[in-house]
């Protein structure tokens, strides 16, 4: 998948038919009711419907006397873009991760519980996005990186002129660190936990603080402490 331009994404969102997907569980005299607007599973007494809220609202109004009870689950409201089809990725994606459509995830990547990845983002092969990390729209993360729990990689869809975050290969971003719009983090760098990165990070350096600054070059001790564990990326 090629890198998405911000204006392309904005145009897609603006022109997309907004959807309010629902799952409805209904009980009653269902014989003779037209469920063609939904994906329907059930019989003449009980059914499960997958479809749009407005269609269900209309169904209720037309057949109120036949429907004895129902339970409604609303998955989103006026949503412009769907979530990704997770089956297309050769990656480990844990329950509770939220991944929008048009996200590229490389083979062997790991997306942990609660991680959020927005439209147009690119996640490289073997990279781990840890729990509750946020990868914003159009952010580009290289291969064999680790994005720590609670970290925020800023997105740049609005304003459309902004440059996306680029994190090169083999970078470790500590827990709760923030990488701001337009920043490039060089290959092999380490961003300390809690750091706020406002400018480019040179390759093979360690940055820390608010705002982040270079505190040292990568040495053997740092390499050992920040080593990527390949076994965690095994899909078999």
Swiss-Prot record:
SUPFAM superfamilies: Trimeric LpxA-like enzymes (SSF51161). One of its GO terms (molecular function) is tetrahydrodipicolinate N-acetyltransferase activity. Gene3D superfamilies: Hexapeptide repeat proteins, Malonyl-CoA ACP transacylase, ACP-binding. It is an enzyme of class 2 (transferase). The keyword Amino-acid biosynthesis applies. InterPro entries: DapH (IPR019873), DapH_N (IPR013710), Hexapep (IPR001451), Hexapep_transf_CS (IPR018357), Trans_hexapeptide_repeat (IPR050179), Trimer_LpxA-like_sf (IPR011004). It catalyses: (S)-2,3,4,5-tetrahydrodipicolinate + acetyl-CoA + H2O = L-2-acetamido-6-oxoheptanedioate + CoA. One of its GO terms (biological process) is lysine biosynthetic process via diaminopimelate. Keywords: Acyltransferase, Amino-acid biosynthesis, Diaminopimelate biosynthesis, Lysine biosynthesis, Repeat, Transferase. Coiled coil: none annotated. Pathway: Amino-acid biosynthesis; L-lysine biosynthesis via DAP pathway; LL-2,6-diaminopimelate from (S)-tetrahydrodipicolinate (acetylase route): step 1/3. Pfam families: DapH_N, Hexapep, Hexapep_2. Catalyzes the transfer of an acetyl group from acetyl-CoA to tetrahydrodipicolinate. NCBIfam families: DapD_Ac. This is 2,3,4,5-tetrahydropyridine-2,6-dicarboxylate N-acetyltransferase. It comes from Thermotoga maritima (strain ATCC 43589 / DSM 3109 / JCM 10099 / NBRC 100826 / MSB8).
